[in-house]
Every structure is written in C-alpha cells, then in structure tokens.
C-alpha cells in the first residue's frame, strides 16, 4: 500500500515539474525529483515515465527546448483556475507580453481590461495565445508587470 501511495506522489510531482516547461534534459528532471525527496529515481525511470505519459520535447514561450506533457493532458477543466492558462509573462520598455494556452488570450485580456486603469492597465490587445498590455498614466511597465505577476501568482 505504501509503495502505491509513494508512486502516486512521484507521478503527481513528475507531472507538476513538466507543467513548468523548464527542464531540457532527463538529468534535470532526475535532480528536481531528488530535491523533492524521491531518492531512488534515476534517468532510466524518468525516461520510462516520459514515454508512459507521452511527454515530448518542444519549445516553450522562451524558445527553449523543454519536456512537456501533450496538450490533451493540460486542457483546462471547469475547476482549474485561470492562472493555469498563463504560461509566461515578460516585458520590455513599452509593453507587458503574456503568453497563454492556445485560445485563452482573449479571456485573460478581458479579465485584465475589466481591472482597468486603477490597477495600471490602459488596455490590452489579444490574439490566440499572446496578449500585449500597456500601462496607464502614472504606472511604469515594470509596475504593470509586477501587478500582473501578482494577479496570476507567477514567480519573479
């Protein structure tokens, strides 16, 4: 029984790591799992798990080749929070750019527009999976970036 519970914890941790879309090698996944207390994990076990769950290497929003789960495993459900649709948030001197799951950009942009100027949002432009948003007067792009990060509980 204990072994089965430990296996479920391993699978849950493994899937959570892949959803982060930042691991470019099996060795990095092994180290991350070991850091979480799964001491007897090794590269061959990670390789079998990647195959079992259909994980693939693809480019993330930062154009890095990383392991991720296929889209059908990451499809949002009625109980999943909106923050799960936000994949990446970045900014430059003019705008904040938000990358979302395919098809989610307009929903997230509408949410941001509803917050309005009081929260520092002058407006948004959304495509299928990318949003440009610009700060209102009195706010810097960095202020807006940090506010959006906080809204979607992303790490700096």
Swiss-Prot record:
Q: Which GO terms describe its molecular function?
A: arginine binding; DNA binding; DNA-binding transcription factor activity
What processes does the entry annotate via GO biological process terms? L-arginine biosynthetic process; protein complex oligomerization; regulation of arginine biosynthetic process
Keywords noted in UniProt: Amino-acid biosynthesis, Arginine biosynthesis, Cytoplasm, DNA-binding, Repressor, Transcription, Transcription regulation
* GO CC term, one of those recorded: cytoplasm
The entry's localization annotation reads:
Cytoplasm
The protein's superkingdom reads: Bacteria
Pfam families cross-referenced by the UniProt entry: Arg_repressor (PF01316), Arg_repressor_C (PF02863)
Query: Annotated pathway, please?
Result: Amino-acid biosynthesis; L-arginine biosynthesis [regulation]
Q: What does this protein do?
A: Regulates arginine biosynthesis genes.
Q: Which family does the entry's similarity section mention?
A: Belongs to the ArgR family.
Please state what the protein is called: Arginine repressor
Its taxonomic path starts at: Bacteria, Pseudomonadati, Pseudomonadota, Gammaproteobacteria, Enterobacterales
């Amino acid at each position: 029984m204990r072994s089965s519970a430990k296996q479920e914890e391993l699978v849950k941790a493994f899937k959570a790591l892949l959803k982060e879309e930042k691991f470019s090698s099996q060795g990095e996944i092994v180290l991350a799992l070991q850091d979480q207390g799964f001491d007897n994990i090794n590269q061959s076990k990670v390789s079998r798990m990647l195959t079992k769950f259909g994980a693939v290497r693809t480019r993330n929003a930062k154009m890095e080749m990383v392991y991720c789960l296929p889209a059908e495993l990451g499809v949002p459900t009625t109980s999943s929070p909106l923050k799960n649709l936000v994949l990446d948030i970045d900014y430059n001197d003019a705008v904040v750019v938000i990358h979302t799951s395919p098809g989610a950009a307009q929903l997230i942009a509408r949410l941001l527009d509803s917050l309005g100027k009081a929260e520092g949002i002058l407006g948004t432009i959304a495509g299928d999976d990318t949003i440009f948003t610009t700060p209102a007067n009195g706010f810097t792009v960095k202020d807006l970036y940090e506010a959006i990060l906080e809204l979607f509980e992303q790490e700096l």
